[in-house]
Amino acid sequence: MKHPEKWRDSIDPFSLPFKNFHLIEVIGYPHAGNDVFQVKGIYKNEIVEAYIKVARQFGADIENEINTIAAIKCDLAPSIIDYDDEKKYFCVSLAKKGERLSSIVGDNSNRASLDYLYEYGNALAKLHATEGIFPDVKDRKFFHIPDKEYFRELGIKFVYDYLISNQPQRINKCFCHGDFHYANILWQQKHISAILDFELSGWGNKEFDIAWALILRPGQKFMNTYEEIYLFMDGYQSEGTCNLDYVKYYMILIYSYFYKIGRTNVEYRSYVKNVFLDYCK
């Protein structure tokens, strides 16, 4: 199996102060905001495959990920086996088996995604039902409406008008994953085998968390039809409840950022523009 090659300068993982884990070799360099290393090492006298995450980007919260995974006791979450004394700098988790949906469906020409999206939505609803006391999710720019000039420069002022006029009357709070998009979900035999990356998790906005999972990213080959979105939502609503109008609102809010992020992708930008025209009626 081909692993991601080194793509930028990063810390030397062999310099980390491991306590429970002995690093043998680095076998891959997954793309991520933080420095992430796919490695082999020794844990409890056995050779294991693991991932090392080292804080790099602004807002990294290794401690939140460690504490959340310990609190929720979710079998699909990674098992964290080592970290620094302050839980601020790095953590090591055992590798989970599975593939991302993007790898499984390829160009999705045969609509293979339809076999997965019901369970995808159902899994998020189950996470949202998690009980406990959690810190509030950290504030993110995506939670807020950009100023009017931002929309004018992009030629979509009507989206600004929609967002200002249709703001949700309340925020429905629950435990949120914070980044439940397809790259953080692994699958085996058409079932979810792992849920990754709990750094952004906490007590937050249920419908925003759903919308974040639903939006199409640049280059993504699924979740670009109403049939797929409805299937995800059917799965969600089989386990939980939500306000569908709020979900739609937050999809538009997030897309207002991704319209600019994906501006060099003509096909993607056209898709998002059509979503605006359809939803912002």
Give short role names for the model-derived ranges:
Residues 46-91, 106-123:
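A conserved alpha-helical element in kinase catalytic cores
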Residues 208-240, 252-268:
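Active-site activation/catalytic loop segments of kinase-like enzymes and analogous catalytic loops
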Residues 18-43:
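ATP-binding glycine-rich phosphate-binding loop
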Residues 1-26:
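Juxta-kinase regulatory segment immediately upstream of eukaryotic protein kinase catalytic domains
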Residues 91-99:
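Short pocket-lining segment of the protein kinase catalytic domain that shapes the ATP-binding cleft
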Residues 35-40, 164-208:
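Active-site acidic catalytic loop and adjacent metal/ATP-binding pocket
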Residues 99, 104-158, 171-173, 202-203:
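A cross-family kinase active-site recognition segment
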Residues 73, 128-132, 218, 237-240:
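Protein kinase-like catalytic domain
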